Amino acid sequence: MTTYFNYPSKELQDELREIAQKIVAPGKGILAADESGPTMGKRLQDIGVENTEDNRRAYRQLLFSTDPKLAENISGVILFHETLYQKADDGTPFAEILKKKGIILGIKVDKGVVPLFGSEDEVTTQGLDDLAARCAQYKKDGCDFAKWRCVLKIGKNTPSYQSILENANVLARYASICQSQRIVPIVEPEVLPDGDHDLDRAQKVTETVLAAVYKALSDHHVYLEGTLLKPNMVTAGQSAKKNTPEEIALATVQALRRTVPAAVTGVTFLSGGQSEEEATVNLSAINNVPLIRPWALTFSYGRALQASVLRAWAGKKENIAAGQNELLKRAKANGDAAQGKYVAGSAGAGSGSLFVANHAY
């Protein structure tokens, strides 16, 4: 086993590290707007709007043309391939609109999950084959970071060793390819909230998964300062008794401290089907845990930033301003939470669960 390898050049290290640091600047986080066509269809169906390309474009136009002060709390937006190349009504590309606001462009690069044969309903994520070429093109088209999601399930016998190892290795290979093309990889190993497991089991599984992920990243010589982690918060299963925000926060920070190297620039939590209010309250609690936290701890939320926006808009032109106002409110609430300053209930957020069983993007 050789221990000789090359780190990226100093120029590449600097570029990757600076992008990662900008994304997790104090009080800022990520808007995940990378829902695929079918997933966006479900969101639109909930408000009685047909899933057409133009309706998807109209909704994303609402998000991206929100007042420039959105950039006070949103540092980056994750786009779906279709969205990166769409334009506003006046012909301005969405990418340009976001860049003018000083918002960094990200892109979802995985191609969804496929079954692991012989496992108990476990999956791995596909999309590595042409990833280098796609990343090179996305960088040319203005993207500076990428996202790749792997999914693990907690059951009596899962996640299995096979699934933990395979998904860790896929994430490491993805991260390595991204960095070779000057793109910061967001590493997302999501332990799903489905099930009736308790907080202790969720914490142990999360620790085991993260330990495997960082071993794989080390094996692939990934430059950690030029990466971000997008994990689940540690919560009991969806059908188990709920814990307090303080209990969730402590379990989450303990799991991260035990497994995530201090070199990692930041952690941008996924909301994982929590209600808007829960996702914000829990993030604020995480930033108040009385333990040393060497990384920025912020958000990369989809549903927890958009549910109120969709409801306010309801597909109607005359409601665009109302929808944008909701987005500003949610972004500000989560920006405060990323600094441990959110006051529960102060943003009038929805408290309805946004959980989707066996969630696929």
Curated annotation (Swiss-Prot):
InterPro entries per UniProt: Aldolase_I_AS, Aldolase_TIM, FBA_I
CDD domains: FBP_aldolase_I_a
Enzyme Commission designation: 4.1.2.13
Pathway given in the UniProt record: Carbohydrate degradation; glycolysis; D-glyceraldehyde 3-phosphate and glycerone phosphate from D-glucose: step 4/4
Enzyme superclass (EC): lyase
Disruption phenotype: RNAi-mediated knockdown is lethal. Glial-specific RNAi-mediated knockdown is semi-lethal. Neuronal-specific RNAi-mediated knockdown is viable with no defects.
A GO CC term assigned to this protein in UniProt: cytosol
Example GO molecular function: fructose-1-phosphate aldolase activity
Site positions per UniProt: Necessary for preference for fructose 1,6-bisphosphate over fructose 1-phosphate: Y361
Catalytic activity: beta-D-fructose 1,6-bisphosphate = D-glyceraldehyde 3-phosphate + dihydroxyacetone phosphate
Induction or repression: Expression correlates to dietary behavior: high dietary activity in the larvae and adults causes active glycolysis and high expression levels.
Annotated residues for binding of substrate: R56, K147
SUBUNIT field: Homotetramer.
Protein family (similarity comment): Belongs to the class I fructose-bisphosphate aldolase family.
Purpose of the protein: Enzyme of the glycolytic pathway. Glycolysis is essential in glial cells but not in neurons; neurons rely on the citric acid cycle for their energy needs, and on lactate and alanine secreted into the hemolymph by glial cells to fuel it. May take part in developmental stage-specific or tissue -specific sugar-phosphate metabolisms. Protein acts on two substrates fructose 1,6-bisphosphate and fructose 1-phosphate (like other class I aldolases).
Name this protein carries in UniProt: Fructose-bisphosphate aldolase
Organism: Drosophila melanogaster (Fruit fly)
Gene behind the chain: Ald1
